[in-house]
């Protein structure tokens, strides 16, 4: 039977689906602090960003009209600007659908096979990720899974007010964490790419303000001297170019984190078929928004046989040729059909693989191996540009157009041997 804590978390998650999230931006920090009494009249503060002069409120759907008076008071008395908090989509296939999962007996390959195919075990003689923090910006991580023992959990793991980062509201975040840095050391079923890396769970519902708060925390860690890698598997689920989100705090926070030295990986997206692309086609473009930036690594998805997954988003990115962009994806990971992997509290078999979501943490784990090797040799960490150059140049071409595969399939052994 689920514990009371688990049941309470499930109720919280259910309540989240019945709320609206609003962002309130104030002219000064003092105005923000004075306004927090608004919580007493129907809204619960989910995130506070005092340095950015922003709070976000969860408002039960039934109370939205009631809150109009309170919002108007916030405008008049505190100068607040009020907008609905932008929400990104979980980078998923149809993981909410039970038909996306298959019985254990239908498994063709598992995470072990993927780890072997990308050369991670061969790299472990040089490095296993020690001394590096991998932040999993996702749906949380199931702390009951033995792949995530307490000694691997970063003490500054993050969740919105009232939530626990070591619970997973969907299952997806546990999958990404296991791929990047799960361990068998305490009875886990799988090792990830970097099994000795520290894991920082950053549990989010993908609201702009939550992502800003997470990246502000990652910035602080990096400025304090931590080696931080962020794995992100969310985006905008669309077959056509989405508009740039207005009034974003996440993008400025992302800028700050990258400037502070956080190495950022993003899944390319699972939108190629939504854009009308054929499985073997390298167009049209379906990599959206910030995933085209040159200062982050964008990762697509191939099958173990080297063919591209039908859904893996193709480049070159939404804003090709603009300043600070580069052709995308940078590379691909691999994910098997009917692949067996941690998903939430269970080990499950996913018919259509793990999406680009399951490939992004492979790249994050590889970066952890590279930086950890530098630590072990008493050498300074590689710069972002050095890391990306090593990873691209050591990747194995699968024979596809660059808009599909980038530089090719990542190779942990070759990358570690290159530095």
What do the predicted segments below correspond to?
Residues 8-26:
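Short glycine-/aliphatic-rich beta-strand segments at the starts of folded cytosolic domains
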Residues 180, 200-204, 335-405:
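Hydrolase catalytic cores
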Residues 26-27, 85-86, 137-140, 179-183, ...:
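Active-site-proximal beta-strand/loop segments in catalytic clefts of secreted hydrolases
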Residues 183, 202-295, 326, 345-361, ...:
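Substrate-binding/access-modulating region of protease and related hydrolase catalytic domains
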Residues 122-155, 163-210, 225-227, 259, ...:
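Subtilisin-like serine protease catalytic core
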């Amino acid at each position: 039977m689920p514990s009371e804590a688990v049941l309470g978390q499930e109720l919280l998650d259910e309540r989240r689906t019945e709320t609206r999230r609003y962002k309130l931006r104030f002219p000064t920090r003092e105005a923000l602090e004075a306004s927090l009494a608004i919580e007493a009249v129907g809204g619960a503060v989910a995130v506070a960003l005092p340095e950015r002069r922003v709070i976000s409120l969860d408002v039960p759907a039934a109370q939205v009209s009631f809150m109009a008076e309170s919002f108007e008071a916030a405008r008049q008395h505190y100068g607040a600007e009020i907008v609905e908090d932008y929400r990104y989509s979980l980078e998923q296939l149809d993981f909410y659908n039970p038909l996306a999962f298959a019985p254990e007996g239908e498994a063709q390959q598992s995470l072990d096979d993927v780890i072997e195919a990308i050369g991670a075990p061969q790299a472990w003689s040089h490095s296993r990720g020690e001394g590096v923090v991998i932040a999993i910006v996702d749906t949380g991580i199931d702390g009951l899974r033995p792949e995530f023992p307490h000694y691997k959990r970063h003490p500054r793991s993050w969740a919105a007010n009232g939530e626990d980062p070591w619970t997973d509201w969907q299952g997806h975040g546990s999958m990404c964490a296991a791929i990047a840095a799960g361990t068998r050391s305490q009875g886990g079923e799988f090792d990830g790419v970097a099994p000795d890396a520290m894991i920082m769970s950053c549990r989010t519902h993908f609201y702009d303000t939550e992502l800003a708060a997470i990246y502000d925390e990652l910035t602080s860690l990096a400025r304090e001297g931590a080696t931080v890698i962020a794995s992100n598997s969310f985006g905008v689920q669309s077959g056509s170019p989405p508009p740039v989100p207005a009034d974003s705090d996440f993008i400025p926070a992302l800028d700050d984190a990258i400037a502070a030295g956080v190495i950022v990986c993003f899944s390319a997206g699972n939108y190629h078929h939504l854009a009308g692309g054929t499985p073997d086609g390298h167009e049209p473009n379906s990599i959206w928004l910030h995933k085209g930036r040159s200062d982050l690594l964008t990762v697509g998805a191939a099958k173990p046989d080297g063919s591209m997954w039908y859904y893996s988003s193709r480049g070159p990115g939404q804003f090709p040729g603009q300043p600070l962009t580069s052709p995308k994806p940078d590379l691909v990971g691999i994910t098997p059909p009917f692949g067996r992997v941690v998903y939430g509290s269970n080990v499950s078999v996913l018919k259509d693989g793990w999406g680009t979501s399951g490939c992004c943490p492979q790249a994050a784990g590889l970066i952890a191996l590279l930086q950890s090797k530098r630590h072990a040799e008493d050498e300074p960490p590689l710069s972002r540009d050095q890391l990306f150059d090593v990873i691209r140049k050591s990747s194995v071409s699968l024979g596809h157009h660059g808009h599909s595969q980038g530089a090719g399939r990542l190779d942990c052994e070759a990358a570690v041997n290159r530095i």
